[in-house]
């Protein structure tokens, strides 16, 4: 008798994706983050669903409904803080996942890579709209400032901003539509994730060495399922510690003040996972220039395959490229710190230099160093 997982039409799909999936025998823990992102997405959808049951998307009651969830709903505080800090864990996993893709040359699997960039855009949009929903000071002013960036688009900019707002300022209509989009986008992200996996399983996973591994593959279960489970436990413990001991560590104190259109906070800044983009945006004194730089922080990832000049896929055997990669990581961490600082000397100057370095490394130095390494290896 044939095993049900190999004969049943639905089980067969699950079997080929998660059980008998041929996987390179040498992939490291850096490959855990894809499955961790899946777990984070499920966690966000479940906690978000429970929050939506108690949240009211009206500017007069939104702030107090969040307070009601934390005070009066059974374990409401746990659900709310798991959702808020779960977003932070999501972005940590997301950035590590993208970083691993750059380090090991996974961007050469173009369909999977481009679908991943679409997913990154979608997750960023979802997180931004979710940050607006508590209707605190930083929610309101963050929404006002970020949506206002679209006014930099020539001719249609102002009309576009008013169309998104549903009026002449961020108001009731804005909150209602942001809630609607924030609710539906995670399900769209889930569908896009399935397509992302579909493209990945067409080509098979990359591996640290960057060479073809078709001759040396092992089944995903139990070898990697147990490894992924360890990753789940590790992230779950960190998230639980954050939620139970320091739930507001990554939040902004201004968001505990109800939104007031007549009182601007001294320093408007987004959540920590957008700070490096925020730093790049404000390092250019021109509005349109800043918006273009902001957009290109992600668009630059799309052209990564075109910038690949090395004869090797992975950076595993390329020490000079490795050095550049870790300088890029340090640069992004510096930009994150700069984004949290006020707009004054020396932070503006440091921000301008680090923004320039970010684009220089990816667009100029990485391709040049790769060509040098080819010469050194006489390729």
UniProtKB/Swiss-Prot annotation:
Positions bound to heme b b566: 97, 196
GO molecular function, one term: metal ion binding
List of residues binding a ubiquinone: 201
Gene Ontology CC entries for this record: mitochondrial inner membrane; respiratory chain complex III
Coiled-coil residue windows: none
Keyword Transmembrane: yes
Gene3D superfamilies noted in UniProt: Cytochrome Bc1 Complex, Chain C
Cofactors that this protein relies on: heme b
Assembly behavior: The cytochrome bc1 complex contains 11 subunits: 3 respiratory subunits (MT-CYB, CYC1 and UQCRFS1), 2 core proteins (UQCRC1 and UQCRC2) and 6 low-molecular weight proteins (UQCRH/QCR6, UQCRB/QCR7, UQCRQ/QCR8, UQCR10/QCR9, UQCR11/QCR10 and a cleavage product of UQCRFS1). This cytochrome bc1 complex then forms a dimer.
Protein name per UniProt: Cytochrome b
Source organism per UniProt: Cryptomys hottentotus choma (Choma mole rat)
Gene from which the chain derives: MT-CYB
